[in-house]
């Protein structure tokens, strides 16, 4: 099978027992009902309602993948991490491991 790097895109993984509830509270789409191996478009907004990032959310049995513009991956991961608090969630940059 041939693989191609998605160099224009960044990929974040969001895993842990609270990942679904955490993303549902943070994003503009209904993540609670997103079935495994399905995807949805979603946005992440500031407290004032301004769009900070938009991405493709891909559900998997292990958690979720967020595909977004490569230059936004690190800042979004850092800022989303500020809202984890006591939730059992891990946010990781998967950019070096993703192939299609």
PLM regions: where:
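Basic, glycine/lysine-rich polyanion-binding surfaces/domains
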Residues: 1-99
């Amino acid at each position: 099978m041939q693989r191609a790097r998605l160099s224009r895109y960044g990929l974040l993984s969001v895993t842990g027992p609270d990942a679904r509830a955490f993303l549902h509270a943070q994003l503009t789409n209904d993540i609670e009902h997103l079935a495994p191996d399905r995807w949805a478009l979603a946005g992440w907004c500031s407290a004032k309602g301004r769009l900070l990032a938009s991405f493709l959310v891909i559900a998997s049995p292990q958690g979720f993948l967020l595909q977004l513009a490569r230059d936004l991956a690190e800042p979004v991961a850092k800022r989303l991490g500020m809202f984890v608090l006591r939730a059992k969630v891990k946010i990781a940059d998967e950019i070096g491991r993703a192939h299609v």
